[in-house]
């Protein structure tokens, strides 16, 4: 079974100013994909996101998906702190998520989310909107098991 963790990057939700809805949606979506899911863990954007990512990697989680903090606001720092945790990026995942979303909502192109690997953990940034989460899940669905298998040392299937 794939072990997943959901981290919500939202300074306002972490302060109790509003109730986040994208985190529970992401948890449910990952469970539908067959994952055992921790979270959602709601943290302020910025360094608390990096700390939560490092904790997930240290805990041996297979995949950690963040929601929020990927926009253009000066407060949106999730991609920057994620980059500092990653060993390497997987640009194709983030590109596919943006392309999928752009088909319905042109502003999906403004998401700065990243995807990559830290240790043996797949890390994916998603937007904080429910639509952005659904788009991310649609893209991750066919990729997740294969990506995790490779990170666990599996071979590429031969076709």
Predicted region positions:
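Non-catalytic beta/alpha edge segments that cap or flank active sites
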Residues: 1-159
């Amino acid at each position: 079974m794939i072990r997943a963790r959901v981290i919500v990057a939202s300074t306002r939700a972490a302060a109790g100013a509003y109730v986040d809805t994208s985190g529970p949606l992401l948890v449910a979506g990952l469970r539908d994909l067959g994952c055992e899911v921790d979270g959602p863990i709601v943290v302020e954007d910025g360094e608390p996101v990096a700390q939560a990512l490092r904790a997930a990697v240290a805990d041996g989680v297979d995949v950690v998906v963040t929601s929020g903090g990927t926009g253009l606001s000066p407060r949106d720092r999730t991609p920057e702190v994620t980059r500092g945790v990653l060993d390497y990026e997987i640009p194709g995942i983030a590109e596919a998520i943006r392309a999928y979303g752009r088909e319905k909502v042109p502003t999906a192109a403004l998401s700065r989310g990243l995807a990559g690997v830290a240790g043996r953990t797949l890390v994916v940034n998603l937007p904080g909107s429910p639509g952005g989460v659904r788009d991310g899940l649609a893209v991750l669905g066919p990729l997740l098991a294969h990506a995790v298998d490779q990170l666990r040392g599996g071979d590429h299937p031969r076709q």
